[in-house]
Amino acid sequence: MLSPERQTHLKQLEAESIHIIREVAAEFANPVMLYSIGKDSSVMLHLARKAFYPGTPPFPLMHVNTTWKFKEMIEFRDRMAAEVGMELIEHINEEGRAAGINPFDHGSAKYTDVMKTQSLKQALDKYGFDAAFGGARRDEEASRAKERVYSFRDKHHRWDPKSQRPELWNIYNGKVQKGESIRVFPLSNWTELDIWQYIYLESIPIVPLYYAAPRPVVERDGMQIMVDDERLPLEDGEVPEEKWVRFRTLGCYPLTGAVESTAATLPEIIQEMLLTRTSERSGRAIDHDQAGSMERKKREGYF
């Protein structure tokens, strides 16, 4: 299915990412790999295991749990953590949970800030991590397109897009003062197509939600929202409908739209992806809750 040229291209991307991961492990005192359980995280974890094979990567995984992830994501996370033998740190913003912060009563912007951004900052401070791997790619979204591979964050974990460090070729500046940190994006130069073809080439396990199947959904604001548990409040006259859907991107289930699809295998997903004309993150409500939404979130310390 993949031409020799495509396989060579993927191997070049693989080599670049492995170099970045090893560079961080050698350069920083206390790195961590942020594990959001999506396809990009799965590829990044696979690359980290390759980078240090036959040993175990010398840093832990960390999942910032909002408590609203799909059930299948949490099951997959626990299974993978046990398989790879890495420490898994789970962090929940307990103040937010105690206050009952949720995407329905408080809106996606406040919910994301409290349960994702503030939670991540709490965890980074608590464990004193000076570098955090993330699975973001430049082709995903405009603000991510201009972010460096080594993305400097100040002592408040804020990102200033107007004051980024020069990054020439594969020379990365990891110097930080106490309290400062670097967000590292080994998949920066990968595209969505690269990710899917690499998953196919390497037989990387992913959450089953990426594959099409009959699932109960309701339509809200133009998005197909899956009814994953009893916490989703149904509106008057709203009845979940069983449809063949899958997810191109995974987040908190009330804020993540499915796409109607019958693509139930990797070759079918890749073929469908080649024909689509919409961004994979068009199904993420948090990207559209206000103008310049993602850049604003990243300035405040978001992933």
From Swiss-Prot:
EC number: 2.7.7.4
Group of enzyme by EC: transferase
Keywords: ATP-binding, Nucleotide-binding, Nucleotidyltransferase, Transferase
Matching CDD domains: Sulfate_adenylyltransferase_2
GO MF annotations in UniProt: ATP binding; sulfate adenylyltransferase (ATP) activity
Record's catalysed reaction(s): sulfate + ATP + H(+) = adenosine 5'-phosphosulfate + diphosphate
Recorded metabolic or biological pathway in which this protein acts: Sulfur metabolism; hydrogen sulfide biosynthesis; sulfite from sulfate: step 1/3
UniProt record, GO biological process: hydrogen sulfide biosynthetic process; sulfate assimilation
Stretches for region Disordered: 281-303
PANTHER family per UniProt: SULFATE ADENYLYLTRANSFERASE SUBUNIT 2
Subunit relationships: Heterodimer composed of CysD, the smaller subunit, and CysN.
UniProt family annotation: Belongs to the PAPS reductase family. CysD subfamily.
Role according to the record: With CysN forms the ATP sulfurylase (ATPS) that catalyzes the adenylation of sulfate producing adenosine 5'-phosphosulfate (APS) and diphosphate, the first enzymatic step in sulfur assimilation pathway. APS synthesis involves the formation of a high-energy phosphoric-sulfuric acid anhydride bond driven by GTP hydrolysis by CysN coupled to ATP hydrolysis by CysD.
Protein name, entry field: Sulfate adenylyltransferase subunit 2 2
Highest classification ranks of the organism: Bacteria, Pseudomonadati, Pseudomonadota, Gammaproteobacteria, Oceanospirillales
